[in-house]
Curated annotation (Swiss-Prot):
Induction: Induced in interstitial capillaries in response to hind leg ischemia. Alterations in nutrition and leptin administration are found to modulate the expression in vivo.
GN (gene name): Angptl4
Name under which the protein is recorded: Angiopoietin-related protein 4
Start and end residues of each Fibrinogen C-terminal domain: 183-405
Location(s), subcellular: Secreted; Secreted, Extracellular space, Extracellular matrix
Post-translational modification as stated in the protein's UniProt record: N-glycosylated.
InterPro entries per record: FIB_ANG-like, Fibrinogen-like_C, Fibrinogen_a/b/g_C_1, Fibrinogen_a/b/g_C_dom, Fibrinogen_CS
Sites carrying sugar chains: N181, N236, N242
């Protein structure tokens, strides 16, 4: 492979490209493959970009030279076109070849012009070729990232330390060695309950893939009642829950700490199935409360309405009629869907939630490290009215969901 001398990164690129091209068409060697590191991939991409910039700069310089040649030819005037007749004289002194110029000089200029045009075309072809190659490399990186999502271990238990956890996850140095067969691996479980049915009994981070959804990581709690998917956790105020609609839709936070899984992911897990919602509450004296009730969760077209049955619907202030009972739409400060016509509950309080009329519950409110003295401030906190009252900010909460068939089976 012939590489023109360019910048240092381009030389690295040429070497890497030559290696890739030479590997094509040869049968696989028995020795284990050498994996390119993530830094080498970055260097390859950086080299591609530098080569592209270098080629473009060369094109610009060539264009400047071409412009100079064109100006020199323009100075020749009509003489560059030659006489109109076999013996036709020049019309006037302006048509004459400038002093010091000869037909041989004009011929040389034309030859140089053609050569420069040819070089420009070749450079444009090289730039286009490198851009296509860079696009293919970007596509390959994206495909490999998808494959690592499929190859990632479906389980990271809570008991392992960070060092051992790092060993469980594939590193970027392994990406280049992945084979096309990786796409035919077993599909991850639909939810934590399906993982429980497959024999998993340890709680921790797992990869799931609900129907019609790409795979993603969730925190699973394995109990005697089956597998529960954790969709929310508050415990120390490390994450700001006063987020926008898009943030609540997509999810935010740290699955190992405080987080909100995301309304769209919750909806993909529940689908059209009925689910059981578990609400774990804790006050500042160490007392705990567990609530469980059936729900349906609508899609974005219903503002992710939480559809409830009696008596929970009354407890949470649901009044909208839905196919599965009474419903509470989800609201944020920039998407007001609550049942108060004169007030935006998310703005008045804090966080996004199924507010109802603002006064029944809000587990995504402002986190307080101690109970504020002012009642006006306490109302913005995390509360569940039927337990500890409207103005008692809770210390910790966890929300979990499980398909109804699991509850019926147990």
């Amino acid at each position: 492979m012939r590489c023109a001398p360019t910048a240092g990164a381009a030389l690295v690129l040429c070497a890497a490209t030559a290696g890739l091209l030479s590997a094509q068409g040869r049968p696989a060697q028995p020795e284990p493959p050498r994996f390119a590191s993530w830094d080498e991939m970055n260097l390859l991409a950086h080299g591609l970009l530098q080569l592209g910039h270098g080629l473009r700069e060369h094109v610009e310089r060539t264009r400047g030279q071409l412009g100079a040649l064109e100006r020199r030819m323009a100075a020749c005037g009509n003489a560059c076109q030659g006489p109109k007749g076999k013996d036709a004289p020049f019309k006037d002194s302006e048509d004459r070849v400038p002093e010091g110029q000869t037909p041989e000089t004009l011929q040389s200029l034309q030859t140089q012009l053609k050569a420069q045009n040819s070089k420009i075309q070749q450079l444009f072809q090289k730039v286009a070729q490198q851009q296509r190659y860079l696009s293919k490399q970007n596509l390959r990186i994206q495909n490999l990232q998808s494959q690592i999502d499929l190859l990632a271990p479906t389980h990271l238990d809570n008991g392992v330390d960070k060092t051992s956890r790092g060993k469980r996850l594939p590193k970027m140095t392994q990406l280049i060695g992945l084979t096309p067969n990786a796409t035919h691996l077993h599909r991850p479980p639909r939810d934590c309950q399906e993982l429980f049915q497959e024999g998993e009994r340890h709680s921790g981070l797992f990869q799931i893939q609900p129907l019609g959804s790409p795979p993603f990581l969730v925190n699973c709690e394995m109990t005697s009642d089956g597998g529960w998917t954790v969709i929310q956790r508050r415990l120390n105020g490390s994450v700001d829950f006063n987020q926008s609609w898009e943030a609540y839709k997509d999810g935010f936070g740290d699955p190992q700490g405080e987080f909100w899984l995301g309304l769209e992911k919750m909806h993909s897990i529940t689908g059209n199935r009925g689910s059981q919602l578990a609400v774990q509450l804790q006050d500042w004296d160490g007392n705990a409360k567990l609530l469980q009730f059936p729900i349906h969760l609508g899609g974005e077209d219903t503002a992710y309405s939480l559809q409830l049955t009696e008596p929970t619907a009354n407890e949470l202030g649901a009044t909208n009629v839905s196919p599965n009972g009474l419903s509470l739409p989800f609201s944020t400060w920039d998407q007001d869907h609550d049942l108060r016509g004169d007030l935006n509950c998310a703005k008045s309080l804090s966080g996004g939630w199924w507010f109802g009329t603002c006064s029944h519950s809000n587990l995504n409110g402002q986190y307080f490290h101690s109970i504020p003295r002012q009642r006006q401030e306490r109302k913005k906190g995390i509360f569940w009215k039927t337990w500890k009252g409207r103005y008692y900010p809770l210390q910790a909460t966890t929300l979990l969901i499980q398909p109804m068939e699991a509850t019926a089976a147990s």
